[in-house]
Structure formats: structure tokens, C-alpha cells
């Protein structure tokens, strides 16, 4: 922990969502003077703003959502969704005003050992599963970060957990310096958020910051099946444990037929049956392996690990079975907001798929799905803002229908489907053209499907 004295400092919080509010609350609790700027016009009568001031006997200032907000500011705390090329952040860097992410801010005060999980896909499942394993082993656990409760909200309180299991996005890693986790996991990196980071190379480099400041007493966990994972491992200061579904590893966990074999690098072996995994898809075997390695690093027994995994049925909106109607199975994978996630979802099924894709484009490389569409997909239904771009890239490979909205896409998919088919919502895009977030999109899908019965 690298303590940061912010008492009396004038701190600019950019963005007034869940993370911005939690950051402001923490800063005020530490005696900072908080200034808030948001693209939506806030007023001091805002319920949350006024309550923050009342609770701590200190008013919160409002600033314009522009460069003028930097006047007499000591540091800037941007919400994760504020891109690094935002004019205020670029100007702050130019003026040498520190830019500190919520994650970095929390880590400066965190007194609980942290397991940090990042990757393009699988973060939430892996984070949740690690939390289940540790809880089942008798540990008091905080689970949060990019899911649920922001880490800065946890450090605002008494920090009573034995371990903090934290999902971390590339947005949160953008502005870190002293960040440190005793176990850091990088699940995978496929093309995503290029419109935020500028390039895939920049995105991947930010993801790799999850290993910042690790030493010999820490643990790094990497996917051996990812390109350049061996090169990355050579650059790390911490011991590296690999996981693989395709090949043996010297230290870590790998799949062999119907079991997982864990090697500690010193001759000791442990075995885990594949039958314990209830989650569909080969990608979830990878998530489970990463969770096992993290849990073993915390001293959990194989028995507790197996018990927790056997009872874990997955997370909402991640290839979640919704309903079977007339022999057609409907699955909600609304969390599949990038092309890599769509690929993994398609590979989960052997039955013919009616695939629903669309929403707000994130510069996805849709062409990489072409071979899978030919092999696995019976029909493609495209919806939302991205429908024309998706149509240009992969429309026509299989029978394709374009619709303006998800509601119409669901109806079209039902008309296309026959007994034995799978209707899969795996959008490959963000949800913000129609919905507040991927959860709202997934709930809408399930409501529409259930209304068919």
C-alpha cells in the first residue's frame, strides 16, 4: 500500500455514475475538497450531491464539463468510461496534473490482499467463481470492482474481508501507477474497445498492467494458449502459473481428456474431474482453471475447490439458458459485447444456431466470424445501430435478416427457428443504442422469449 494524503486537496471527479459517486464519497471522507464535472448538467440540488455534503459537513462543487474544470485542481479522478483522449484528461496530462483512476485511488488505501482478474472475456465468471471458492473455504471475501461494488467503496469502510476479489477492466487500468495485486490473472485478449484505446496493441498493453509492481512473493496467472503469453511471462517479476486446454504446462493447470491436472513445478500433482464443471463451453473450462489456480494460491484445499465449482451454475447473461419452446432453445449471452465473446458462444453449441447480433458498434472485427458462421450458424438476424456495418462484413454468408430493434430481431429469429435449433443472443456490440446496459438488454430478451409461451 502506497498511502496518499489527500486531506485538503482539491480533487476533480469526472463522471457521476456509480464509480464517480463512490470516488467522491471516499475523497470527502478523507478530507478532500471535491469538484464534480459530468456531461449531464448536474445541480447542487441533486439528491446524491446534497446528501454527500450533508453527511460530511462539506459542500461539493460543480464544474463545467470542459477544460475550465481544471482550475486550481490538485488531481483528477475520471470514471472508467471517460476515454484517455478526453480534452480534460489530455489537458491535465499537459499541465502535469495527476490523473488517478478509481482503482489506483482505492489501491493507495487498500489493506486487504487482492486477487485481480482481467481479460477481454470471462472476467465476471472467473471473479464470481473465485469468490465462491474462497467463501466456501471459510474466508470472508469482498467481490467487486468492475462488477457490483467499486473497490473504492470497499476501502471507504472498515475493510474487514480476508481477501478482495476484484474484476478489472482495461478502462480502470488506464490510469494506474502504484496498483498491486498479490494474485493477478490475465484470461485472454481479443480485439475490443479499440474506439477507447486507439489500437489493439494499446488495449493489450493496458491489460498487461494488471501485473504492475508484482514481485517474487506474488503470483501471475496466464493463459498458455494465448499468443505471446510466453514472451509476457519472461518479462514478469512474479512466479507465473499457466493454464491450458490444449497442451501440458510445467507449472499450472492443463486439460487431459476428462480431467484437469495441476502441477506446482516441484513434482506435486493434483487432479480435478471435468465433470465438476456445470458451465457450458470450452471457454468456461479456461475460466475454471484460472479460478482454481488463484484459489490454490490462497491455500484452498482441492476438496473445497471441487465443492464450490460443482455448485456453481454461472452468471446471468453469459450463455444463460432462458427457455425451450417447441423444441427451440433460447440463450441469453447479452454480455457478449465483442467478437471474441460471440466466437466463444457459437463454439459452445453443436445444434444449428439462429444468431442475433447488433447494437452499438465498437469497431468489431466481424469478418473473423465468417468460418464459424458457415459451419455452425443456420441464420443471422442483425439489429440496431450496427446492423448495416455487420451486414457489409458478414451478411449473406448465411441467410440474413436486418431489423431496426432487438424486439423485431427476436420475433424474426422465432420465425426462422425449428425444433432442434438454438436461438442465441450474442450481440458482439454494446447495448447503448437501445438499452442502459447489457443487463437491461438481456432482461428484455428473456421477457420477450417468456412471453411466447
Swiss-Prot record:
Domain of life: Bacteria
Coiled-coil ranges (or none): none
UniProt xrefs under PANTHER family: UDP-N-ACETYLMURAMOYLALANINE--D-GLUTAMATE LIGASE
Reaction it catalyzes: UDP-N-acetyl-alpha-D-muramoyl-L-alanine + D-glutamate + ATP = UDP-N-acetyl-alpha-D-muramoyl-L-alanyl-D-glutamate + ADP + phosphate + H(+)
Source species: Syntrophus aciditrophicus (strain SB)
GO CC, any one term: cytoplasm
Predominant cellular place of this UniProt entry's protein: cytoplasm
Entry EC no(s): 6.3.2.9
Residues where ATP binds: 119-125
Family: Belongs to the MurCDEF family.
Name assigned to this protein: UDP-N-acetylmuramoylalanine--D-glutamate ligase
Localization in the cell: Cytoplasm
GO molecular function annotation: ATP binding; UDP-N-acetylmuramoylalanine-D-glutamate ligase activity
Purpose: Cell wall formation. Catalyzes the addition of glutamate to the nucleotide precursor UDP-N-acetylmuramoyl-L-alanine (UMA).
InterPro entries in alphabetical order: Mur-like_cat_sf (IPR036565), Mur_ligase_C (IPR004101), Mur_ligase_C_dom_sf (IPR036615), Mur_ligase_cen (IPR013221), MurD (IPR005762)
GO biological process: cell division; cell wall organization; peptidoglycan biosynthetic process; regulation of cell shape
Pfam families: Mur_ligase_C (PF02875), Mur_ligase_M (PF08245), MurD-like_N (PF21799)
Gene3D superfamilies membership: Mur ligase, C-terminal domain (3.90.190.20), Mur-like, catalytic domain (3.40.1190.10), NAD(P)-binding Rossmann-like Domain (3.40.50.720)
Keywords annotated in UniProt: ATP-binding, Cell cycle, Cell division, Cell shape, Cell wall biogenesis/degradation, Cytoplasm, Ligase, Nucleotide-binding, Peptidoglycan synthesis
Pathway: Cell wall biogenesis; peptidoglycan biosynthesis
Enzyme class name: ligase
HAMAP family assigned to the protein according to its UniProt record, in alphabetical order: MurD
Amino acid at each position: 500500500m502506497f498511502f496518499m494524503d489527500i486531506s485538503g486537496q482539491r480533487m476533480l471527479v469526472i463522471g457521476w455514475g456509480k464509480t464517480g459517486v463512490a470516488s467522491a464519497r471516499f475523497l470527502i471522507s478523507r478530507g478532500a475538497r471535491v469538484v464534480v464535472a459530468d456531461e449531464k448538467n448536474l445541480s447542487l440540488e441533486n439528491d446524491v450531491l446534497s446528501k454527500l455534503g450533508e453527511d460530511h459537513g462539506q459542500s461539493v462543487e460543480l464544474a463545467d464539463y470542459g477544460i475550465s474544470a481544471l482550475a486550481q485542481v490538485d488531481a483528477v479522478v475520471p470514471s472508467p468510461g471517460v476515454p484517455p483522449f478526453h480534452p480534460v484528461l489530455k489537458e491535465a496530462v499537459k499541465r502535469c496534473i495527476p490523473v488517478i483512476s478509481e482503482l489506483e485511488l482505492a489501491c493507495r488505501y487498500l489493506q486487504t490482499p487482492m486477487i485481480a482478474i482481467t481479460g477481454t472475456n470471462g472476467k465476471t465468471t472467473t471473479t464470481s467463481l473465485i469468490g465462491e471458492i474462497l467463501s466456501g473455504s471459510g474466508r470472508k471475501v469482498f467481490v467487486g470492482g468492475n462488477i457490483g461494488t467499486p473497490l473504492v467503496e470497499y476501502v471507504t469502510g472498515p475493510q474487514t474481508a480476508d481477501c478482495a476479489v476484484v474484476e478489472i477492466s482495461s478502462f480502470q487500468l488506464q490510469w494506474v501507477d502504484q496498483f498491486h495485486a498479490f494474485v493477478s490473472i490475465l484470461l485472454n485478449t481479443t480485439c475490443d474497445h479499440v474506439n477507447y484505446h486507439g489500437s489493439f496493441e494499446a488495449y493489450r498493453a493496458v491489460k498487461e498492467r494488471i501485473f504492475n509492481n508484482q514481485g517474487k512473493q506474488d503470483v501471475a496467472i496466464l493463459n498458455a494458449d494465448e499468443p505471446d503469453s510466453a514472451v509476457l511471462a519472461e518479462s514478469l517479476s512474479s512466479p507465473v502459473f499457466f493454464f491450458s486446454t490444449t497442451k501440458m504446462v510445467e507449472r499450472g493447470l492443463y486439460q487431459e481428456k476428462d480431467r484437469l491436472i495441476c502441477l506446482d513445478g516441484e513434482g506435486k500433482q493434483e487432479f480435478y474431474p471435468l465433470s465438476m464443471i456445470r458451465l457450458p463451453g470450452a471457454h468456461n473450462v479456461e475460466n475454471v482453471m484460472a479460478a482454481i489456480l488463484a484459489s490454490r494460491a490462497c491455500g484452498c484445499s482441492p476438496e473445497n475447490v471441487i465443492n464450490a465449482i460443482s455448485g456453481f451454475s454461472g452468471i446471468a447473461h453469459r450463455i444463460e439458458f432462458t427457455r425451450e419452446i417447441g423444441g427451440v432453445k433460447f440463450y441469453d449471452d447479452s454480455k457478449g459485447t465483442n467478437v471474441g465473446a460471440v466466437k466463444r458462444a457459437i463454439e459452445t453449441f453443436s445444434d444449428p444456431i439462429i444468431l442475433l447480433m447488433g447494437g452499438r458498434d465498437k469497431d468489431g472485427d466481424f469478418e473473423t466470424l465468417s468460418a464459424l458462421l458457415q459451419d455452425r450458424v443456420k441464420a443471422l438476424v442483425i439489429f440496431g445501430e450496427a446492423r448495416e456495418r455487420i451486414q457489409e462484413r458478414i451478411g449473406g454468408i448465411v441467410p440474413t435478416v436486418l431489423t431496426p430493434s432487438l424486439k423485431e430481431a427476436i420475433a424474426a429469429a422465432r420465425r426462422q427457428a425449428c425444433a432442434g435449433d438454438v436461438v442465441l443472443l450474442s450481440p458482439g456490440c454494446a447495448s447503448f443504442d437501445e438499452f442502459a446496459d447489457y443487463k437491461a438488454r438481456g432482461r428484455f430478451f428473456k421477457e420477450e422469449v417468456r412471453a411466447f409461451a
